[in-house]
C-alpha cells in the first residue's frame, strides 16, 4: 500500500448509513451496496500488515474486530467503502455492523460539519430520532468528534437502530467510522465498542510526532 497519498492498514471502509445519511457527494445509500460502486482493492489482513515494510504518508488505522469479517468493499472516485459484520452474518442481514468511510483528498470538512449534516439526515429519515454527544478533542494530533444516534423504528427495516459515529479530520483526507446496532446495545457492548473506536486513529509517516507504527 505504498506510494499513495492515503493508504489503509487493516481497515474496513463502509458506505451504508442505515437511514440514508450522507456527508459529501455520496451516491444514494441503501441497505444494499450501491450499484454504481466498483470493487475496491482487497484490504490486507492483520498479519500481512504487521509484516509489511511499514506505512507511508497519511493512514487510517483500524483493526478488524475479533469475530468479524469484511463482507463488502468498493471505491468510487474519492470515496472508499467497506462493510464488516459478524462472521455468521452478512450485509443483507446483520445485528451489528462496523462502517468506515474514507473521503480521499477531502480537507474542507470538519467533524462538526459532518455531525450536523449526518444528524440532520438521520432525523429526516427516522421519526423521533435522538442524538447525543459522546466525546471530542484530538487524538494523535487529529481533531475528532464522537456522537450517538438513535432511531426507535427504521421505516425500511422495522427495527430500532443505535449508531455511534466517529469523524476524524486528516490533513489529506476525511474519515468517518460507524458502529451500528439493530438492537439496544448492552453496557458491555458499549464499553467494548467505545474502546474499539478509541483505537481507530490517523497517523502520518511524514510527521514524526504522528508517526505510523
List the predicted regions and their residue ranges.
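Bacterial N-terminal signal peptides
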Residues: 10-20
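Signature of long, low-cysteine stretches enriched in small and polar/charged residues
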Residues: 120-166
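N-terminal "mature-domain start" segment
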Residues: 42-80
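Ser/Thr-rich, Proline-interspersed low-complexity disordered segments
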Residues: 21-47, 51
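Surface-exposed amphipathic alpha-helical segments
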Residues: 171-213
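Bacterial N-terminal signal peptides that target proteins for export
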Residues: 2-11
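Short, solvent-exposed recognition patches
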Residues: 102-130
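Secretory pathway targeting signatures of secreted, lumenal, and periplasmic proteins
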Residues: 66-108
Amino acid at each position: 500500500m505504498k506510494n499513495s497519498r492515503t493508504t489503509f492498514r487493516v481497515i474496513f471502509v463502509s458506505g451504508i448509513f442505515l437511514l440514508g445519511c450522507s456527508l459529501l457527494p455520496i451516491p444514494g445509500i441503501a441497505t444494499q451496496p450501491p450499484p454504481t460502486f466498483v470493487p475496491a482493492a482487497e484490504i490486507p489482513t492483520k498479519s500481512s500488515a504487521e509484516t509489511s515494510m511499514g506505512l507511508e504518508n497519511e493512514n487510517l488505522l483500524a483493526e478488524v474486530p475479533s469475530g468479524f469479517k469484511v463482507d463488502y468493499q468498493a471505491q468510487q472516485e474519492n470515496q472508499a467503502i467497506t462493510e464488516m459484520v459478524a462472521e455468521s452474518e452478512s450485509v443483507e442481514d446483520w445485528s451489528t455492523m462496523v462502517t468506515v468511510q474514507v473521503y480521499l483528498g477531502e480537507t474542507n470538512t470538519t467533524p462538526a460539519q459532518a455531525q450536523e449534516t449526518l444528524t440532520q439526515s438521520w432525523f429526516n429519515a427516522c421519526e423521533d430520532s435522538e442524538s447525543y454527544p459522546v466525546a471530542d478533542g484530538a487524538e494523535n494530533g487529529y481533531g475528532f468528534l464522537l456522537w450517538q444516534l438513535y432511531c426507535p423504528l427504521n421505516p425500511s427495516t422495522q427495527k430500532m437502530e443505535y449508531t455511534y459515529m466517529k469523524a476524524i479530520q486528516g490533513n489529506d483526507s476525511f474519515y468517518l467510522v460507524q458502529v451500528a446496532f439493530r438492537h439496544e446495545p448492552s453496557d458491555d457492548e458499549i464499553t467494548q465498542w467505545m474502546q474499539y473506536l478509541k483505537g481507530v486513529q490517523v497517523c502520518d509517516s511524514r510527521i514524526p510526532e504522528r508517526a505510523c507504527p
